[in-house]
Design a protein with these regions (language model features):
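Short beta-strand segments
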Residues: 1-7
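A short, well-ordered alpha-helix in the C-terminal region of glycosyltransferases
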Residues: 139-154, 166
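Conserved donor-binding/catalytic loop of nucleotide-activated donor transferases
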Residues: 67-69, 87-94, 98-101, 109, ...
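Nucleotide-activated donor-binding/catalytic signature segment of Leloir-type glycosyltransferases, i.e.
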Residues: 6, 15-63
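Aromatic "clamp/platform" in nucleotide-sugar-dependent glycosyltransferases that forms part
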Residues: 77
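Short glycine/serine-rich donor-binding loops of glycosyltransferases
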Residues: 82-85, 103
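C-terminal alpha-helical cap of glycosyltransferases
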Residues: 24, 133-134, 153, 157-209
């Protein structure tokens, strides 16, 4: 079963329209769909359903779904960072995502997931088939461990806090660029020139020439 999960606000026209388009597309491909807005109804969905739409879910239910997943598909293009792949990898789930934006930084190709062109359907299909039918349990477990380790090492609160602290420390410890002797002399002459011009102007004004 393919489970589609996303933040959904019925007041936003684009959300409603996009859901309708996805449902219609799945139906046109001969797949049975269902939409569930509550946890009880989602749990009672029959196994004959091919695509399940969950417009909005709680964090606890999301984590429960991730724990039972084989692969997370992340389709946004040029996403600035994307927290969803991080959440999946933290749960030990490999991620297949668009090779643009944030996933380029968060996903390690072939180790914690895969990056493919969003418009290349065969490439995405190939990865899905690989995960579901070709990779052995040992290989999937290795990816799961690597995904968890990457999140802990690079994107955990501790890791990001240490990185931020290091950057701030480097900024505070950097010394101001020192002037060399020539620069100091030129600066002094410039200041003297300005001072002399001001003095002459004052004298001329005092004696009535200006």
């Amino acid at each position: 079963m393919v489970t589609w999960i996303g933040g959904y606000d019925p007041r936003i026209t684009e959300n409603v329209q996009y859901h309708k388009e996805l449902d219609a597309l799945a139906t046109s491909l001969g797949m049975q769909t269902a939409t569930s807005k509550t946890v009880p109804s989602a749990l009672s969905i029959p196994s004959s359903i091919d695509v399940l739409f969950l417009p909005s879910v709680s964090s606890a239910f999301r984590d429960s779904l991730l724990a039972k997943s084989s692969l997370l598909l992340y389709t946004p293009v040029n996403e600035h960072f994307g927290i969803v792949p991080i959440e999946a990898m933290r749960a030990g789930i490999p991620v297949l995502a668009s090779n643009t934006g944030g996933p380029l930084e968060t996903i390690v190709e072939g180790k914690t997931g895969w990056l493919r062109d969003s418009g290349d359907v065969p490439a995405w299909t190939s990865v899905i088939e690989k995960v579901l039918y070709q990779l052995g349990a040992d290989e999937l477990q290795k990816m799961s461990v690597a995904a968890k380790e990457r999140v802990e090492a690079e994107f955990s609160l501790r890791a990001m806090g240490e990185r931020l602290e290091g950057e701030i420390g480097e900024m505070l410890s950097s010394e101001r660029r020192q002037f060399n002797g020539g620069q100091q002399a030129l600066l002094l002459l410039g200041m003297l020139g300005v001072g002399f011009a001001v003095l002459v102007g004052s004298v001329l004004a005092w004696v009535g020439f200006v």
